[in-house]
Amino acid sequence: MPFIRRPKRAILIPPLHLTLKDDDKVLVVETVGTLIISGMTPSNLTEKLGLAMKLASAILGGDSHPAFNPLVEIFSGAMEFGASVEKLDFMTRENKVITTYKVARGKAVALSNFPMEKRVGEKSYTTQIRNGSITYTGSFLFSAEHVGLKDNRSLFAAGEGLRESPDMAQAREAFAGSLPKGKNESSRK
């Protein structure tokens, strides 16, 4: 009896944004504000993602919050066009580069089992980075919407593409190395 080999079939798994039904709920994060980075200007996507992760983690208290990835997407996207100024730091007597970015209307979508409805008024958030700091001053709106509404499906697809990019993997590794031991390790595998 001859042994017949069947060709292997490739099983294609469609992206998540195509398998969601129109009535599935997503968490929509919107923000308006000003992002100020002192001490450095991010030059590539990996640096932008790393700085955005650091700031989003400081705002949300860690990276396990469902709004973490949308905020990273909003902040890294806002770091495209900014105004840089050199100012003298009186403590160290060195010139520091201060770059300001405007977040006109940042919006991103994330899948969440329990989307929340919350408005956070204008506040200022600051976190330290090597040779400087990142400050975001702005307001947030967290809302639950259906996937089929407005442009949520395309926003979800763009976010998924960014999360699967090699730049995001490099930024995640650098971000994981910068965290103190014992914090937020359960969410990263």
From Swiss-Prot:
It holds the Pfam family Rhabdo_matrix. One of its GO terms (molecular function) is structural constituent of virion. Its main location: virion. It comes from the Viruses. It is a peripheral membrane protein. Keywords: Apoptosis, Host membrane, Membrane, Viral envelope protein, Viral matrix protein, Virion. Transmembrane segments: none annotated. One of its GO terms (cellular component) is host cell endomembrane system. Disulfide bonds: none annotated. It is found in: Virion membrane; Host endomembrane system. Plays a major role in assembly and budding of virion. Completely covers the ribonucleoprotein coil and keep it in condensed bullet-shaped form. Inhibits viral transcription and stimulates replication. Most abundant protein in the virion. Homomultimer. Interacts with nucleoprotein and with the cytoplasmic domain of glycoprotein. Belongs to the novirhabdovirus matrix protein family. This is Matrix protein.
